[in-house]
């Protein structure tokens, strides 16, 4: 991972399913030029792997707290990850 590129594995909890959170995440990530994926989890949370320029990753982590209209985010937990794990582009996956 280069100095200006980073990746984060993120778990978002709250009312984040049934509110187009994955579509919103993909749109925001593409707008910010991030690579990675997002998926719903069976416990009602959403998990995402985001990778790209440090500033863009930081902005996306901030955006997760707001989410799309209808979402009510309770927590955004992130940990550093390897950017090599992120596919090129951004996609919605299934858990």
Swiss-Prot record:
It catalyses: an acyl phosphate + H2O = a carboxylate + phosphate + H(+). PROSITE patterns: ACYLPHOSPHATASE_1, ACYLPHOSPHATASE_2, ACYLPHOSPHATASE_3. It is an enzyme of class 3 (hydrolase). Residues 7-94 form the Acylphosphatase-like domain. Residues 76-95 are annotated as: Disordered. Keywords: Hydrolase, Plasmid. One of its GO terms (molecular function) is acylphosphatase activity. Gene3D superfamilies: 3.30.70.100. It comes from the Bacteria. The active site is at residues 22, 40. NCBIfam families: PRK14425.1. Belongs to the acylphosphatase family. This is Acylphosphatase. It comes from Rhizobium meliloti (strain 1021) (Ensifer meliloti).
């Amino acid at each position: 991972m280069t100095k200006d590129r980073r990746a984060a594995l993120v778990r978002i909890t709250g009312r984040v399913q049934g509110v187009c959170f994955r579509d919103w995440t993909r749109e925001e990530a593409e707008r910010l030029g991030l690579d990675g994926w997002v998926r719903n989890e069976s416990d009602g949370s959403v998990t995402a792997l985001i990778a790209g320029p440090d500033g863009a990753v930081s902005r996306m982590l901030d955006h997760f707290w707001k989410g799309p209209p209808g979402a009510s985010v309770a927590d955004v937990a992130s940990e550093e990850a390897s950017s090599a794990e992120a596919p090129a582009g951004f996609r919605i996956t299934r858990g």
